[in-house]
Design a protein with these regions (language model features):
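Long, well-ordered alpha/beta core segments of mature domains
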Residues: 2-271
Length: 271
């Protein structure tokens, strides 16, 4: 059965199996401690024309990107594992998708680590069921096309960049939503993403908030959320920020049929 004749259910099953394979491979290699590197790689990719894998493939010799080489080496092993399990006729995972999924995996694991620490601080034994019950979904979109060459150079902000410089840098990514004058990555997602990309996210958020009223308001909002058991407002907005950064609006070229492959009827079971 060729790709063009697949039913909607079959396409969904194939894409779900592919996603689960990618997630399993990443969770065995990427941890919460990798979140700063994973998010910085995603930022570097988005900044050079959209998430298309160019940061990992062609741009590791640029300034701050050089420090990401060990993390990219880890992702190469993950990619090899994912691709080795591809079905006949199925494309290997793109570097654009792997960059997005790695950031998603590391950030999700940092959420879990925060909840575990909160349970333990209260003298409660954490368990996966309880953590899952208070966790928010982290949306996924796959099918990013990889670049054939390096994108336009755009360095990540310096460690001592001012709040205004951070906001301006993020405002330069992608195009605003239709009918909106607000940047694609406005103050709130900028605070989340830059905090997540920093070795000490709490300290960096505090530094930015101390010098900018808009960022201070965003930090206060998320601090209140992070004091709750579910951390819903913070985690939902963080997931949206990561997805927005890797979206078509940031410059990614996305083909949702990228990982479909020919199948026999027996290969895709509808349950």
């Amino acid at each position: 059965m060729g790709v063009s004749t697949l039913t909607t259910f079959q396409k969904s099953a194939i894409n779900q199996e592919f996603l689960e394979r990618c997630v399993a491979a990443l969770e065995g290699a990427v941890t919460a401690a990798d979140a700063p590197a994973a998010v910085r790689l995603l930022l570097a990719d988005a900044a050079s024309g959209g998430v298309d894998g160019s940061a990992a493939l062609f741009e590791l010799n640029r300034g701050a990107n050089k420090s990401l080489a060990p993390f990219v080496a880890k992702l190469k092993d993950v990619k090899a594992k994912i691709d080795a399990e591809s079905r006949p006729g199925q494309a290997g995972v793109s570097w654009g998708d792997l960059t997005f999924l790695a950031a998603r995996s590391a950030v999700k694991q940092s959420f879990v680590a925060a909840k575990v620490a909160r349970f333990e601080a209260r003298g409660v034994e954490p368990n996966s069921g309880a953590i899952q019950a208070i966790s928010s979904p982290f949306p996924v979109q796959l099918g990013r096309k990889d670049a054939a060459a390096a994108g336009p150079p755009r360095e990540l902000p310096a460690p001592n960049a001012s709040p205004a410089e951070i906001k301006e840098w993020f405002a330069g990514i992608g195009t605003p939503p239709k009918g909106s004058n607000r940047p694609l990555i406005f103050a709130r997602p900028a605070l989340i993403l830059w905090g997540a990309a920093s070795a000490d996210g709490a300290a960096e958020e505090a530094r930015l908030a101390a010098g900018d009223a808009e960022l201070a308001s965003a930090k206060a909002f998320y601090d209140r959320s992070r004091l709750t058991a579910s951390r819903t407002d913070y985690e939902v907005d963080a997931a949206e920020a990561v997805l927005r950064l890797a979206s078509a609006r940031s410059g990614a070229v996305i083909n949702e049929a990228a990982y479909l492959h020919p199948v026999t009827v027996e290969q895709v079971k509808i349950t």
